[in-house]
Amino acid sequence: MAIALEYVREIYYRPLLQLVYEAQTVHRQHHPPGRVQLCALVNIKSGRCPEDCAYCPQSARYSTGIETYPLISLESLRQQAMAAQRAGATRLCMGAAWRSAPAGEAFERVLEMVRLVRKLGMEACVTLGMVSAAQAQQLAAAGLTAYNHNLDTSPAFYPRIITTRTYRDRLETLAHVAAAGLQICCGGIVGLGESDEDRIGLLHVLANLTPPPTSVPINALVPVAGTPLGQLPPPDPLLLVRTIATARLLLPTAQIRLSAGRKNLSESEQALCFLAGANSIFTGERLLTTPNPGQAADAALLEKLGLQPL
């Protein structure tokens, strides 16, 4: 049965401390308390993307000074994956700055990357832009665990952030992923200039995906100079907490991943996010092209909070 927009709105606007308490209660019913999955994100192809996502430094339309490079080698991926695994990561996500996954040799190499990561005993996730039904089937056959394709924001606010790909395009890719039997990894970004109603709209769509996402990355905008949103301030951390808590109540069995923007959060603010139901983080010095707390800082934080890696 579909989850009503008004139901999502009612949850979102609950008093914050009550909302966090309820989210943590539900979290403990479905997940081991005090356990956090560590993930790593490898940028397997950087920059020169033809799209116009207003937040993204990898767009070829903006001058952001990022390092650009073509699809990396299998050996480079192997070294990065093994380093992440030694640091405690059990899931590796591979991101490529494409509008759509390409055909031919590049896609074949991605399939080899998936097989490599799975042979190491890690979960494998990729985010390659839009994929066809046939490509989703090939990724599943290679052993892919999950496909990431974020919705970013509400259907209403979306055209103000991206014009080169429609919301329907994104939902179509998610349908291909689901039809292939892959897990859906899908979330959004807080701090794009959206309203509370836009965050509610995003959560409403996420809660009604069929099947529901098993992984929900909640990102805080990292403003990057040169992008259209580069002058925005980082979002209020309590908006992030409210969004995470609402997501936890709507998607009780999902991994809620506290993703981009952690570098701008204090330890106390990150602790509130965990209390609100986040149970996964990305480790390493960078998330694609933006800074991220390093592994040493994350290890110290988890120890301070009494959290253990899954």
Curated annotation (Swiss-Prot):
Radical SAM core domain: residues covered: 34-262
EC code: 2.8.1.6
CDD domains hit by this protein: Radical_SAM
Molecular function in Gene Ontology: 2 iron, 2 sulfur cluster binding; 4 iron, 4 sulfur cluster binding; biotin synthase activity; iron ion binding
SMART domains hit by this protein: BATS, Elp3
Pathway: Cofactor biosynthesis; biotin biosynthesis; biotin from 7,8-diaminononanoate: step 2/2
Signal peptide residue numbers: none
Annotated InterPro entries: Aldolase_TIM, BATS_dom, Biotin_synth/BioAB, Biotin_synthase, Elp3/MiaA/NifB-like_rSAM, rSAM
Listed Pfam families: BATS, Radical_SAM
Key words, A-Z: 2Fe-2S, 4Fe-4S, Biotin biosynthesis, Iron, Iron-sulfur, Metal-binding, S-adenosyl-L-methionine, Transferase
Cofactor binding remark: Binds 1 [4Fe-4S] cluster. The cluster is coordinated with 3 cysteines and an exchangeable S-adenosyl-L-methionine. Binds 1 [2Fe-2S] cluster. The cluster is coordinated with 3 cysteines and 1 arginine.
Binding site for [4Fe-4S] cluster: C49, C53, C56
Binding positions ([2Fe-2S] cluster): C93, C125, C185, R257
Entry's Gene Ontology BP terms: biotin biosynthetic process
PANTHER family to which the protein is assigned, alphabetical: BIOTIN SYNTHASE, BIOTIN SYNTHASE, MITOCHONDRIAL
NCBIfam families: bioB
Record family assignment: Belongs to the radical SAM superfamily. Biotin synthase family.
Subunit structure: Homodimer.
Known function: Catalyzes the conversion of dethiobiotin (DTB) to biotin by the insertion of a sulfur atom into dethiobiotin via a radical-based mechanism.
Protein name per UniProt: Biotin synthase
Organism, as annotated: Synechococcus sp. (strain JA-3-3Ab) (Cyanobacteria bacterium Yellowstone A-Prime)
